[in-house]
Each structure stands twice: as structure tokens, then as C-alpha cells.
């Protein structure tokens, strides 16, 4: 089976792992996935992440719970291989009225919508997390 959208696969593994109350989830590693995990950790949506550098690098994401409930309520892919979504600095969406974050790929790397707005940058909207 070929994987057409590895980012959607990562988000689905996180969503399913939290629904099943797993401590962590493992997936094939890639630079973009590591960057997404870094942003999720900085925003407090996951506890930690680690890359096991073996023959096939594997990314392990440690999930976060608060009072037994998953911290991530929704995690949704926006821009996908078949339909890329780009937004300018003034068009960046506010997820759940500012309570959630949109992860945006800019020329300066991956960042949240708030950081991109502060830096006056737009880019490709990768996903929404709330």
C-alpha cells in the first residue's frame, strides 16, 4: 500500500491513538512530521516526541491527556496533495475563535497562525488543531 498523504496519516494516528487512550503512537519519520510534532509540543497538545534513528527512522509521539480526556479535541488536515490551501497574512484563519491553532508552512518554516500573523507572513495551511 502506498501512502498518498503522510501528513494526513500522522494526524489520523494521533487522533486514533487518543481515542483509544494510547500513551504514544509511532509512525515513519520525515522532516515535515518532526516539524509538526515540534509545533504541537510547543503549543502543549502533545507531551513529547522522539525520533528513533534506525534503518527506517521512526517518529514516536507521546500523547497528552488532562483528567483522563485527550488534550486534542480536533485535529484536521486542511491543505492536501490534491488541493493546496494558501492564505496571505491577513487571511490566516483563527481556529475556534483563537482557542485552537492552525499550523502554517511559511518561508521561515512551520509555525502557528499567531506566530505567522506576528511576523507578517502567510503560507500553506497544513492543519487545524483544537
From Swiss-Prot:
<dbReference type="InterPro" id="IPR035987">
    <property type="entry name" value="Ribosomal_uS8_sf"/>
</dbReference>
<dbReference type="InterPro" id="IPR047863">
    <property type="entry name" value="Ribosomal_uS8_CS"/>
</dbReference>
<keyword id="KW-0699">rRNA-binding</keyword>
<comment type="function">
    <text>One of the primary rRNA binding proteins, it binds directly to 16S rRNA central domain where it helps coordinate assembly of the platform of the 30S subunit.</text>
</comment>
<dbReference type="GO" id="GO:1990904">
    <property type="term" value="C:ribonucleoprotein complex"/>
</dbReference>
<keyword id="KW-0687">Ribonucleoprotein</keyword>
<dbReference type="GO" id="GO:0006412">
    <property type="term" value="P:translation"/>
</dbReference>
<keyword id="KW-0694">RNA-binding</keyword>
<keyword id="KW-0689">Ribosomal protein</keyword>
<dbReference type="GO" id="GO:0005840">
    <property type="term" value="C:ribosome"/>
</dbReference>
<comment type="subunit">
    <text>Part of the 30S ribosomal subunit. Contacts proteins S5 and S12.</text>
</comment>
<dbReference type="InterPro" id="IPR000630">
    <property type="entry name" value="Ribosomal_uS8"/>
</dbReference>
<comment type="similarity">
    <text>Belongs to the universal ribosomal protein uS8 family.</text>
</comment>
<protein>
    <recommendedName>
        <fullName>Small ribosomal subunit protein uS8</fullName>
    </recommendedName>
</protein>
<dbReference type="GO" id="GO:0019843">
    <property type="term" value="F:rRNA binding"/>
</dbReference>
<dbReference type="GO" id="GO:0003735">
    <property type="term" value="F:structural constituent of ribosome"/>
</dbReference>
<dbReference type="Pfam" id="PF00410">
    <property type="entry name" value="Ribosomal_S8"/>
</dbReference>
Amino acid at each position: 500500500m502506498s501512502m498518498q498523504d503522510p501528513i494526513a496519516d500522522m494526524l489520523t494516528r494521533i487522533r486514533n491513538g487518543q481515542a483509544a487512550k494510547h500513551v504514544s503512537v509511532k509512525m515513519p519519520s520525515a522532516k515535515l512530521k518532526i516539524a509538526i510534532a515540534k509545533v504541537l509540543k510547543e503549543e502543549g497538545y502533545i507531551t513529547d516526541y522522539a525520533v528513533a534513528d534506525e534503518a527506517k527512522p521512526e517518529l514516536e509521539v507521546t500523547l497528552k491527556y488532562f483528567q483522563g480526556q485527550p488534550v486534542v479535541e480536533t485535529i484536521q488536515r486542511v491543505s492536501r496533495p490534491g488541493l493546496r490551501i494558501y492564505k496571505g497574512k491577513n487571511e490566516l484563519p483563527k481556529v475556534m475563535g483563537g482557542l485552537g491553532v492552525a499550523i502554517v508552512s511559511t518561508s521561515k518554516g512551520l509555525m502557528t497562525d499567531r506566530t505567522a500573523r506576528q511576523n507578517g507572513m502567510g503560507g500553506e495551511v497544513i492543519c487545524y488543531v483544537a
